[in-house]
C-alpha cells in the first residue's frame, strides 16, 4: 500500500478551499445571459466550447491531491444538481463557494464548525420552505417556453421548440434530442405508440415512395413465441380474410414457411399482412406486448393465459385506426383500447418507476408510460459546424430537463431574485447559540451570490444592483440581458423552483462537510524511479573483420 500524507486542521481546509475556488472560478464565468464560454481540450478532435457549468466542472482534475479533494467535492454539487433537476449547476457551484468562503472565516476565528453547520442547515430548510411558498405552477405553453429559453442561455427558439413538443406529446411524453441534418432546428412528432422493430421482409412494403407498409383499420395479433408453422396461423388468417381487413402480426419471430406464406398472400393481394418481431427482451418483452394489447384492446396469445394460436378468434385481436411499419420502426396510431384500461396500466407502470432501483430500468419504464400516455417527439438540432452542434445539443438537453422540473414543482422569478426574496423572509431567523446564528448569516450572504455573479458577468457593479433588488418586492429584479429593472416573471426570466431548491440544498450539504473537515488523507506523489544505466554492449565480433 502506498504511503499517505495526513494533513490536519487549517492546513487541510485551506488547501481544499483552494481547490474549491479554482473549480468554482472556472464554472461561475458561465452564469447568466452575459456569461462567457469555457473552452475544453479534447484528446482527439477539436476543442469543445461550452456554457454548461457541469460540463466544465467534470473536466477539472487538479495536480495537488488536497486541492483536488476540494474541487471534487464541489464537482459533486454540480453533478447532483444536474442529476436531480437537470439544470442550476452553476448556481449550485456559486452558492457552495460562497458558503465555504464565508464559513472558513468563522472557523478560523474559533467558532464551532458543527454549530455553524447546524445554523446553515436551519437557514437552508427555512429558505426552501419560503421558495415553495413563492412558487407558482407552470402550466401554459408561454411559461414552458420561457423556462426553456432561459435555461438554454436566452435562446428563445429552443424554448419555443420544447414548448411545441410538450404541447404535442403531453407533459408525460418522451422528448428526445438528436443531431439534425440541416442548419435549422426541426421537430418530428410521432403520435401513438412507436417501437423499434420493423418489417421482417421487404415484400410487405405497400408504399414504395416512403418504403413503409401502411395498414388502415387493421387487426393486431400478439404472440409471445416464435411462429414457424403456417398451420398454427390458418384459423385466425381465415377469420381476418373473411372480415376483409389487414393484419399485423407481432411475435417473438415469424420464420420459415409461415413467413413465406404470408409474403406470397401479400404479393397476390389475397390477404394484406405484415409481420414484425416483438420489441424488447425477456420480461420487458412480455410487459411491452401487454402494453400493446391494452393500447389496441386485444389480448396476448400466450400459454400462460391459456390461449393458443389455433384457438385464437377475432375477439382476442387488437385493433387500430392505422399502423405504419418501416424498416426499423412500427407506429400504432389510435389504438382501439379502452381509455380506462390504458389509464390503469399507466398508473401501474408509474408505481414501478417509484420502486425502480437502476436508472436504466427507470428510463425504460418512463418510455413505456410516454408511449401509452402520449407519443414521442424528436427535436433535431441544426447547426453549421460539429462544435456548434455539440454545444447547442447540450443546451437543448439542459433546457428540456429544466422545463420538466418547472412542470413538476412550478416556477419562481429568475436571475437570482427568488433567493433574494427568500432571504428577506428568513432574515429574522435565530439559532440556539451565537455560532448557529453565524451559520444562518453565512447562508443569508450566500443567497446574494448568484445575483452578484450574474451582474459581475454582465460588467456592472454587483453591490448597487443587489441593494436595489433587495429594496424591491415580489418579482421585481434586474434583467442582466437588457440591463433594466423589471418584473422578472412578466419579462419571462423564470427559473424552475426545483432547480433553485436543489442548488441551495446540495451546495449547503457539501459546503457543510468541508467546513467540518479536520483532517485530510492523500497519497504521497510517487517519486520517479531513476533511469536504468547505459545501453548494453553489442554482441562480440559485431563489425569486426573476420
Swiss-Prot record:
Skewed-composition ranges (Gly residues): 534-546
What sections of the protein cross the membrane? none
Q: GO molecular function of the protein, one example?
A: ATP binding
Query: Where in the cell?
Result: Cytoplasm
Question: What are the boundaries of the region Disordered?
Answer: 526-546
Q: What is this protein called?
A: Chaperonin GroEL 1
- Name the family: Belongs to the chaperonin (HSP60) family.
Q: Name the predominant localization.
A: cytoplasm
EC number per UniProt: 5.6.1.7
| Pfam families for this protein | Cpn60_TCP1
* Entry GO terms, CC: cytoplasm
Query: Keywords assigned by UniProt?
Result: ATP-binding, Chaperone, Cytoplasm, Isomerase, Nucleotide-binding
What biological process terms from GO does the record include?
Answer: protein refolding
Is Cell membrane included in the keywords of this UniProt record? no
Give me the reactions it catalyses.
ATP + H2O + a folded polypeptide = ADP + phosphate + an unfolded polypeptide
* Organism of origin: Burkholderia cenocepacia (strain HI2424)
Q: Which sequence ranges form a coiled-coil region, renumbered to this chain?
A: none
What start and end residues bound the annotated signal peptide? Answer: none
Role played: Together with its co-chaperonin GroES, plays an essential role in assisting protein folding. The GroEL-GroES system forms a nano-cage that allows encapsulation of the non-native substrate proteins and provides a physical environment optimized to promote and accelerate protein folding.
Summarize subunit and interaction data from the UniProt record for this chain: Forms a cylinder of 14 subunits composed of two heptameric rings stacked back-to-back. Interacts with the co-chaperonin GroES.
**Domain of life per record:** Bacteria
Q: Which residues bind ATP?
A: 30-33, 51, 87-91, 415, 479-481, 495
Amino acid at each position: 500500500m502506498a504511503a499517505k500524507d495526513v494533513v490536519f486542521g487549517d492546513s487541510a481546509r485551506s488547501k481544499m478551499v483552494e481547490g474549491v475556488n479554482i473549480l468554482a472560478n472556472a464554472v461561475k464565468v458561465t452564469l447568466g445571459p452575459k456569461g462567457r464560454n469555457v473552452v475544453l481540450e479534447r484528446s482527439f478532435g477539436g476543442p469543445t466550447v461550452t456554457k454548461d457549468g457541469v460540463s466544465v466542472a467534470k473536466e477539472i482534475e487538479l495536480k495537488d491531491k488536497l486541492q483536488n479533494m476540494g474541487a471534487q467535492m464541489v464537482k459533486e454539487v454540480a453533478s447532483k444538481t444536474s442529476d436531480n433537476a437537470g439544470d442550476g449547476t452553476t448556481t449550485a457551484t456559486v452558492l457552495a463557494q460562497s458558503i465555504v468562503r464565508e464559513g472558513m472565516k468563522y472557523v478560523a476565528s474559533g467558532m464551532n464548525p458543527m454549530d455553524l453547520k447546524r445554523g446553515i442547515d436551519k437557514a437552508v430548510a427555512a429558505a426552501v420552505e419560503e421558495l415553495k411558498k413563492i412558487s407558482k405552477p407552470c402550466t401554459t405553453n408561454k411559461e414552458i417556453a420561457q423556462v426553456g429559453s432561459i435555461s438554454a442561455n436566452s435562446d428563445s427558439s429552443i424554448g419555443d421548440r420544447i414548448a411545441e413538443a410538450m404541447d404535442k406529446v403531453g407533459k408525460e411524453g418522451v422528448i428526445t434530442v438528436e443531431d439534425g441534418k440541416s442548419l435549422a432546428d426541426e421537430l418530428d412528432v410521432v403520435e401513438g405508440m412507436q417501437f423499434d422493430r420493423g418489417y421482417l421482409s421487404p415484400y410487405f412494403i405497400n408504399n414504395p415512395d416512403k418504403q413503409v407498409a401502411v395498414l388502415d383499420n387493421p387487426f393486431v395479433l400478439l404472440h409471445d413465441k416464435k411462429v414457424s408453422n403456417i398451420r398454427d396461423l390458418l384459423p385466425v388468417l381465415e377469420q381476418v380474410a373473411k372480415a376483409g381487413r389487414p393484419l399485423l402480426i407481432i411475435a417473438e419471430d415469424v420464420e420459415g414457411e409461415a413467413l413465406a406464406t404470408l409474403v406470397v398472400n401479400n404479393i397476390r393481394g389475397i390477404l394484406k399482412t405484415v409481420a414484425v418481431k416483438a420489441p424488447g427482451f425477456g420480461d420487458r418483452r412480455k410487459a411491452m406486448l401487454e402494453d400493446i394489447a391494452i393500447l389496441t384492446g386485444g389480448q396476448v396469445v400466450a400459454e400462460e393465459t391459456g390461449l393458443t394460436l389455433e384457438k385464437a378468434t377475432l375477439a382476442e385481436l387488437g385493433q387500430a385506426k392505422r399502423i405504419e411499419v418501416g424498416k426499423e420502426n412500427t407506429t400504432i396510431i389510435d389504438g382501439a383500447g379502452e381509455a380506462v384500461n390504458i389509464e390503469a396500466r399507466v398508473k401501474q407502470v408509474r408505481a414501478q418507476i417509484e420502486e425502480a432501483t437502476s436508472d436504466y430500468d427507470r428510463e425504460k419504464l418512463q418510455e413505456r408510460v410516454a408511449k401509452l400516455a402520449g407519443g414521442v417527439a424528436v427535436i433535431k438540432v441544426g447547426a453549421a459546424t460539429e462544435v456548434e452542434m455539440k454545444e447547442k445539443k447540450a443546451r437543448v438537453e439542459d433546457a428540456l430537463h429544466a422545463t420538466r422540473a418547472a412542470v413538476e414543482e412550478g416556477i419562481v422569478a429568475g436571475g437570482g431574485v427568488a433567493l433574494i426574496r427568500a432571504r428577506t423572509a428568513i432574515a429574522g431567523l435565530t439559532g440556539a447559540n451565537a455560532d448557529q446564528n453565524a451559520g444562518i448569516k453565512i447562508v443569508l450572504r450566500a443567497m446574494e451570490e448568484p445575483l452578484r455573479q450574474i451582474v459581475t458577468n454582465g460588467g456592472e457593479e454587483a453591490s448597487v444592483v443587489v441593494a436595489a433588488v433587495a429594496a424591491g418586492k415580489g418579482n421585481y429584479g434586474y434583467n442582466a440581458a437588457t440591463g433594466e429593472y423589471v418584473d422578472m416573471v412578466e419579462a419571462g426570466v423564470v427559473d424552475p423552483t426545483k432547480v433553485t431548491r436543489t442548488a441551495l440544498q446540495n451546495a449547503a450539504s457539501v459546503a457543510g462537510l468541508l467546513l467540518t473537515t479536520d483532517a485530510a488523507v492523500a497519497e504521497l506523489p510517487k517519486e520517479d524511479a531513476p533511469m536504468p544505466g547505459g545501453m548494453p554492449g553489442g554482441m562480440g565480433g559485431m563489425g569486426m573483420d573476420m
